[in-house]
Amino acid sequence: MHSILPRFVTDPFLDRCYAALEVIAAQGTAIGAALAALTAVAGDSLAVKNTGDAAPAKLLQLWTDVQVAGTVRLRSPKFHDNVQGMRFDTIIGDIRPLLPWGISQAIYPNDVLVAELAGSAVAGDVETLAMLNYYPNLPGAAARFITPDEVMRRAVNIFTVENTLALGTAGGWSGGEAINVEFDQFHAGAQYALVGYVVDVECAAVAWRGADTANLRVGGPGEETERELTANWFMRLSKAFNLALVPVFSAENKGGITVEGVQDENGADVTVNSIFVELSR
C-alpha cells in the first residue's frame, strides 16, 4: 500500500519533502442575502493545482470573515454532491475554522471549486472565504515541513517576531513585509519551525511565504480573540491530520520570508506575532 504521507529525502538539517500547503482566499463585495459566487483574490485560484498521478490533494480547513451573518457554500462535482456540497451558516466577525479537525475533503487536479457567500448588501462591504489546501506530492515544490514530534525533539528556544501589516482597503492579500524588517534577532545559520502565531486585530487570513514554503502562502485565520487556536496553529494541524505540516524556515532566507494578510474594506492594520521554535541541528 502506498503511503499518503509526504515523501522525504535526506537533508543535513531536516527532511525535505515534496508536500505543499497553501492558504487561498476568495472574496465578494456587497454580495447580498442570496448566495453569490466569489472570485479568488489576485494571485490565488479556486482551481486545484495539478498533482499528476500523485495522491489527491486535501482541503484541510475553511473559514469566513463576514460583516453580516449569512451562508457560505463550497461545492464541486467531486464532492458528496454538487448541489449544497459543504454549507454553513456564518457569524459576524467569527474567523474560526468550520471543518472538523482531522477529517479532510479530497480535492482533485484542475477541479475548479465553486465558492459562494450570502451576507452584507451594504455598498463596499467585502466578504471573504479562506481555505487551506494540502498537496502530498506537488511537482516542483520544495517546501520544508516537519512533525510536532520532530519539533519537540529538536526544540532549543521559543522565538517570536513581530510584524505590523499595513493592510489595504481593496481586499486581497496586502501589507506584505519581510519578516525581519521590524525585529531581526535570527541566529545565523539556524533553522526555525513556525508553530503558530497571534494577531491583535481581526482579519480574514495571515500567511507566510518564501523559498522554504515553495513560494506558496502557508497560514491561517486572523482570529484575534481565541489566541489558543492560532498560537499552535501548525502544530494543531499536524497532530489533527497526522501529517508533517509545521513549516521550517532557514535564518539565511529571512529577507525573503514575507508576512501578509487579507483584510476587508475597512483596512485595519494587524500586528502579527510569529511564534517560532529554534531547532537543534
Model-derived regions, located:
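Beta-strand-centric surfaces of beta-sandwich/beta-rich domains
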Residues: M1-R281
